[in-house]
């Protein structure tokens, strides 16, 4: 009898310990799981959005979220406890916490299963992040076997359904990596960790596994079982998509690169002569000159300022160009004249600016003095060019201070290139380089968000009467709030590559970011020897152009020596031109 009483008392004490460790909070619940030494919190941001965080201690780590700008609302929560579970309901969803294992289950208000964590599916493995102690953090879920998943940004696999694969989510040219998935069931999960992350889906589990982090941190979004509802939740959580200027919705012509103001304006003239609508034209790189002067944000190339032959300016001639070449007397002699000519002819001008600087530039020298350069190899290689640190607010201030010179010149739109940023020969030292917010590794995928944020916020501070238009090569969750559209990077001119962009663009858009496009015709024309007279190349260009009509932004582009203006493919009456 005495032993029986002791056992009963022991069970009561253990049950009591678990009960004491589960706390109902103003916005959800908090649970300390003794067997795992893990604290988990459920925090409702609205009826549609709930945040789940877990960390291996009793003390909440300090963590910044770059995409999330919403503050939690007051949500009417209904609590129910039974059989070791705590159920919390809002008007749109039910979240169930297993108080012993910490497993979280998500249901709709009718009690139908949406998705659930795998039991004991949160893992923390101690590791080093440069000089800091950190963890490899993973979270595993269990999806329905026949469920389709979308999202993950813009990949180059050609897969629309993201099941049955493993992907390393680390931004690079042609791959935009967003740790967000959305289901045909009408829910979305955003894994809030910007370090390189492996997404894996097998018949047994679906998981996110990040290189470094101090907590498992994700947001579950569910409204009415539709993608409209999920995307509304994304915009509520991370910011509304800005309205782009009306003129951005027309046709854009771009080439790598127009090599003088006359060359750019002659392309505009030809479109006007042919009666082909053209709303925008793009000035690509090297208007600043040579690689050492990379991204000076000034017109210093002597061909742009009528200084060919002037010894003081010839040192800025782009690498590989002939200093003895003879050119006719320019019709348009200054950048200001070029901008005014474009505007006079009812078009708009976009210009290329990068997230890196050459050692001759004033920006490089100032950023170096404030330890705001990331000193790893980037494009162009072997030129001493380095990316800046957009996580440093003072570096973003400096970036705009120089960019404003081009804004004051009348430039209409920004091509913020290489916002991954480009990187080569990366090892432990390079990924461990410090930023203002920790190691480069720990914040890597958020680089494009912060870099575009700097341009957007500074220009809006100067004038809120002019809408922004930023074309950028990389992106992150929430980037729709910064007036930017992403293109799919420097892809090659091939049918299979074109096909892959379709799935990439759809999955990117399902991450809540509506503005996206490709280089119409592809960037690298190697497959056809950069020959626009090749009939096979013309066929590809025509089909891509037809698809381009349905992209959010219609922009023709190619790499030198290819030329892709439509009149290069023939005259009126020739099938490729007429199509």
Q: Each predicted region: which residue ranges?
A:
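Bacterial Sec-dependent N-terminal signal peptides
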Residues: 1-22
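Generic recognition of long tandem-repeat/solenoid scaffolds
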Residues: 29-35, 52, 84-91, 104-107, ...
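A low-complexity, Ser/Thr/Gly/Pro-enriched, surface-exposed linker/loop concept
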Residues: 21-22, 28, 43-87, 125-127
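Broad, structure-driven detector of short, well-ordered beta-strand segments within folded domains
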Residues: 40-44, 93-99, 189-191
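Catalytic-domain carbohydrate-binding cleft regions of carbohydrate-active enzymes
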Residues: 112-579
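Hydrophobic or amphipathic alpha-helical targeting/insertion segments
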Residues: 89-116
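Noncatalytic nucleic-acid binding interfaces
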Residues: 20, 34-38
């Amino acid at each position: 009898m005495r032993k029986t009483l002791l056992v009963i008392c022991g069970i009561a004490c253990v049950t009591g310990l678990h009960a004491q460790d589960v706390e109902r909070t103003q916005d959800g619940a908090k649970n300390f799981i003794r067997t795992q030494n893990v604290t988990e919190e459920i925090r409702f941001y609205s009826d549609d959005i709930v945040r789940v965080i877990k960390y291996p201690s009793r003390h909440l780590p300090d963590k910044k979220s770059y995409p999330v700008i919403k503050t939690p609302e007051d949500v009417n929560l209904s609590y129910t406890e039974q059989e070791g579970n705590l159920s919390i309901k809002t008007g749109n969803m039910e979240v169930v916490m297993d108080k012993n294992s910490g497993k979280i289950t998500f249901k709709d208000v009718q009690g139908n299963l949406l998705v659930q964590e795998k039991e004991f599916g949160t893992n923390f493995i101690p590791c080093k992040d440069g000089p800091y102690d950190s963890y490899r953090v993973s979270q595993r879920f269990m999806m329905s076997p026949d469920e389709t998943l979308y999202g993950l940004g813009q990949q180059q696999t050609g897969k629309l359904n993201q099941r049955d694969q493993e992907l390393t989510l680390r931004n690079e040219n042609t791959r935009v990596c967003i740790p967000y998935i959305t289901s045909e069931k009408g829910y979305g999960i955003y894994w809030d960790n910007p370090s390189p992350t492996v997404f894996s889906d097998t018949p047994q589990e679906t998981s996110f596994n990040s290189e470094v982090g101090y907590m498992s941190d994700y947001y579950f979004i569910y409204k009415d079982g539709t993608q409209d509802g999920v995307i509304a939740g994304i915009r509520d959580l991370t910011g509304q998509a800005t309205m782009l200027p009306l003129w951005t919705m027309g046709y854009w012509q771009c080439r790598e690169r127009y090599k003088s103001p006359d060359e750019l304006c002659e392309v505009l003239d030809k479109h006007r002569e042919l009666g082909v609508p053209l709303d925008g034209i793009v000035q690509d790189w090297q208007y600043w000159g040579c690689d050492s002067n990379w991204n000076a944000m000034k017109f210093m190339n002597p061909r742009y300022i009528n200084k060919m032959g002037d010894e003081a300016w010839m040192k800025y001639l782009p690498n590989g160009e002939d200093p003895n070449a003879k050119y006719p007397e320019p019709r348009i002699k200054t950048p200001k004249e070029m901008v005014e000519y474009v505007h006079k002819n009812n078009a708009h001008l976009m210009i290329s600016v990068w997230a890196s600087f050459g050692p001759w530039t004033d920006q490089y020298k100032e950023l170096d003095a404030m330890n705001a350069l990331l000193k790893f190899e980037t494009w162009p290689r072997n030129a001493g060019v380095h990316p800046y640190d957009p996580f440093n607010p003072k570096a973003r201030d400096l970036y705009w201070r120089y960019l404003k010179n081009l804004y004051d010149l009348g430039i209409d739109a920004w091509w913020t290139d290489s916002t991954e940023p480009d990187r080569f020969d990366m090892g432990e030292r390079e990924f461990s380089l410090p930023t203002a917010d920790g190691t480069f590794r720990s914040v890597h995928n958020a680089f494009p968000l912060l870099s575009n944020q700097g341009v957007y916020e500074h220009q809006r501070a100067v004038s809120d009467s002019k809408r922004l238009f930023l074309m950028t090569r990389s992106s992150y969750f929430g980037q729709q709030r910064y007036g930017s559209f992403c293109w799919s990077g420097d892809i090659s001119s091939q049918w299979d590559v074109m096909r892959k962009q379709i799935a990439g663009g759809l999955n990117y858009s399902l991450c809540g970011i509506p503005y996206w496009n490709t280089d119409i015709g592809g960037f690298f024309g190697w497959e056809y020897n950069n020959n626009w007279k090749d009939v096979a190349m013309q066929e590809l260009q025509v089909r891509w152009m037809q698809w381009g009509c349905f992209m959010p932004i219609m922009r023709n582009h190619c790499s030198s020596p290819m030329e892709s203006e439509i009149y290069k493919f023939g005259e009126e009456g020739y099938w490729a031109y007429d199509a």
